[in-house]
């Protein structure tokens, strides 16, 4: 399943799949300013695109990142993906940080009512996925808590070297 512009839900759906090997994790790509420059994204007519956040799947034992929004291919060895998707010489304001959340924990805690995909008047910014929103009223809309790297909601926050360590341990 894949719906453009709903990367967090795409990863949430993948993490629920019994076919995926364990361990597995959700990786939020963002930074304090919410301005991450990424290359190779399908949503961009030309590179780079600047995302407020992006979410990919990590398969640590395999050292693989699954990015369903990548133009070239969906699965990459983590170091190759980092070299492909980011540039070392980019201004710090556009450099990525990563929140890595264990798959089962993300599936159990993530909740989105999709309100972030509506403008001030309530108009949809992008077409909705065909599946129901992964919203739990008891948790409320918590997507932006995962994006906020200072929020201790779940997982660990690391730089690129830390992501490589997690992916290859």
Residue ranges and their predicted role:
Residues 1-169:
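A structural boundary/capping signal
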